[in-house]
Amino acid sequence: MHFSSSSTLFTCITLIPLVCLILHASLSDAQLTPTFYDNSCPNVSNIVRDTIVNELRSDPRIAASILRLHFHDCFVNGCDASILLDNTTSFRTEKDAFGNANSARGFPVIDRMKAAVESACPRTVSCADLLTIAAQQSVTLAGGPSWRVPLGRRDSLQAFLDLANANLPAPFFTLPQLKDSFRNVGLNRSSDLVALSGGHTFGKNQCRFIMDRLYNFSNTGLPDPTLNTTYLQTLRGLCPLNGNLSALVDFDLRTPTIFDNKYYVNLEEQKGLIQSDQELFSSPNATDTIPLVRSFANSTQTFFNAFVEAMDRMGNITPLTGTQGQIRLNCRVVNSNSLLHDMVEVVDFVSSM
């Protein structure tokens, strides 16, 4: 079909409401597909990749940080870029949630990425898809698998602070708590939990999140008994009592900047950095996760295959599609005059059909 934007906009404004409602319903049923931007913004992945490559020169942590942003976005109302929104008078930002405050990072990189994409393809690529592509590219650039992610998401109109506080897994979670957290967002396979936890194969963590493990586990005055004793002494040297709680420690002591399967080798040796990681192998409830840890430790390709599958499943958690939500021009704020702007998006969407 071919319409001029002005004629279609006039038609949508003047036609009886039922016709526009039917149009809206049909567009809202759109499905995610890796080819979504093949015609409208074919270079989006290259733009994202180039932005990350430039940032890695000065910030080797950024790839892991972007992957974490995507994870924390998808666990709160689906992958809708709600984590990128700043505070407004209408809602509190998810950046202030317990799992994000003083730890979520990489927002300026996403800003630069979005500006570059907007310059090449105005009003086309959502922030939700941008963050999804950025997570995939970050993994690949760090030595992990390469795959084409399903696309076509749109951006939320608000943030969800309370939901972020309720949904984001904590570093002190037990295995049953982790399973509940994943199950609550539709990730009910043990392989989802174990494979996605492998995102901790690169990146860093702050001392504040492991102090109890090192010195006062479960208020016993003793360290976590599942910690390898040699590794315990190493961590205590990096995170001493009364030390800097913001000091950084590598998640993976073997290959801290490479996306590989060494995270699982560490778990087998009781060298998981945070409690929720080691729970996958050392919990009394780990009968279903231990075989997966061993399988991934034995085969990088087995881990990569499971990780890609789990990432696609996570990326498909209740996405906004079609005419739901909007395509933000600035990932930090909802578009002003959003009703008129979103109507223009509908016109553009129909005109491309």
From Swiss-Prot:
Entry binding sites for Ca(2+) 2: 201, 252, 255, 260
Cofactor field: Ca(2+); heme b
Source superkingdom: Eukaryota
S-S bridge residues: 41-121, 74-79, 127-331, 207-239
Compartments (UniProt record): Secreted; Vacuole
Cofactor note: Binds 2 calcium ions per subunit.
Residues that hold substrate according to the record: 169
Alphabetized UniProt keyword annotations: Calcium, Disulfide bond, Glycoprotein, Heme, Hydrogen peroxide, Iron, Metal-binding, Oxidoreductase, Peroxidase, Pyrrolidone carboxylic acid, Secreted, Signal, Vacuole
Keyword Disulfide bond: yes
Task performed by this protein: Removal of H(2)O(2), oxidation of toxic reductants, biosynthesis and degradation of lignin, suberization, auxin catabolism, response to environmental stresses such as wounding, pathogen attack and oxidative stress. These functions might be dependent on each isozyme/isoform in each plant tissue.
Name assigned to this protein: Peroxidase C1A
Top-level taxonomy: Eukaryota, Viridiplantae, Streptophyta, Embryophyta, Tracheophyta
